[in-house]
C-alpha cells in the first residue's frame, strides 16, 4: 500500500462519481476501488502521498457536495499493510473476502 489511503463516502453514485473525478484530477493519486455500503451509501478509495491524498479528498468532497450528500471523508496516513488486502484492484471493488482473510491471518 502507498503512503496514504483516502476515502469519501456519499449517498448515491452520482455524488461518488463527481467526487472520484475531482479527486483524480486534483492530485496525483490512484483510484483503488469503491464499495457499496447499503442504503444508498457508496465509498471511493484513492491512494498516494499523504499531501496528494489530502488535496484529492478535499477536492472530491467539495465536488460531491455540489450534486449530492457527502457522508464522510477520511485520510489514513501510513495504513497498516494488512489493509491493502481489503482493496481488490482486479475488480475495482473493495474485497470483504480479502479483509476477512487478513483478519483471520492475525489470529
Place the predicted regions along the sequence by residue.
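Long, contiguous binding/interaction regions
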Residues: 1-40, 47-107
Amino acid at each position: 500500500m502507498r503512503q496514504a489511503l483516502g476515502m469519501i463516502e456519499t449517498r448515491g453514485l452520482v455524488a461518488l462519481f463527481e467526487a472520484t473525478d475531482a479527486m483524480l484530477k486534483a492530485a496525483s493519486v490512484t483510484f483503488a476501488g469503491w464499495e457499496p455500503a447499503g442504503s444508498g451509501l457508496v465509498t471511493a478509495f484513492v491512494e498516494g502521498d499523504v499531501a496528494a491524498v489530502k488535496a484529492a479528498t478535499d477536492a472530491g468532497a467539495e465536488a460531491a457536495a455540489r450534486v449530492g450528500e457527502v457522508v464522510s471523508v477520511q485520510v489514513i496516513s501510513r495504513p497498516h499493510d494488512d489493509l491493502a488486502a481489503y482493496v481488490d484492484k482486479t475488480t475495482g471493488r473493495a474485497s470483504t473476502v480479502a479483509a476477512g482473510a487478513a483478519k483471520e491471518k492475525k489470529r
